[in-house]
């Protein structure tokens, strides 16, 4: 690592810490030549391959902007959108791949968005999955209803269990 002050090609790591919720490493470095300290931030690169075949760096802000449109008029805050984008990025990075197709990013958005707001989920899914008819919406809604019923039954079963004490 070159010193930004004297351009010496060596530097010594003084301190390392996790940054950005574990997706980056912040290192404090010191130049042995001039003695000055500087900070570097190391992240792994994550490239999104678009349909055209062009690659571009993953962007949380693009995820937020895309989901924000689906959330217009819904009780979803900017903090909710930021948390969703973070969850999407963590899911994608957990795959360990350096490159991911844009389609996979969209799939990674669907599950956390469904948990956040079902109406926004339907809006996003209708565009992302190219709904073409009312039947497509009806199918998606019936799946949401079925999942809600299953969750309600599971929650009811847990609350009716008696404590062994």
Swiss-Prot record:
Its cofactor is Zn(2+). GO terms for biological process: negative regulation of DNA-templated transcription. Residues 46-136 form the ATP-cone domain. Binds 1 zinc ion. Pfam families: ATP-cone (PF03477), Zn_ribbon_NrdR (PF22811). Belongs to the NrdR family. This is Transcriptional repressor NrdR. The lineage of its organism: Bacteria, Bacillati, Actinomycetota, Actinomycetes, Micrococcales.
């Amino acid at each position: 690592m070159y010193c930004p002050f004297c351009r010496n090609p060596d530097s010594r790591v003084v301190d390392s810490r996790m940054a950005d919720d574990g997706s980056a490493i912040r290192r404090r470095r010191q130049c042995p030549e001039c003695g000055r300290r500087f900070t570097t931030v190391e992240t792994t690169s994550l490239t999104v391959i678009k349909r055209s075949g062009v690659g571009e760096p993953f962007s949380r802000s693009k995820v937020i902007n895309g989901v924000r449109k689906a959330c217009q008029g819904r009780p979803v805050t900017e903090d909710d959108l930021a948390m969703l984008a973070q969850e999407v990025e963590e899911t994608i990075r957990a795959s360990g791949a350096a490159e991911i197709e844009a389609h996979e990013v969209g799939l990674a958005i669907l599950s956390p968005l469904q948990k956040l707001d079902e109406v926004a989920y339907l809006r996003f899914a209708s565009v992302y999955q190219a709904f073409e008819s009312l039947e497509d919406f009806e199918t998606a809604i019936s799946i949401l209803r079925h999942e809600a019923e299953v969750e309600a039954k599971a929650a009811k079963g847990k609350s009716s269990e008696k404590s062994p004490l």
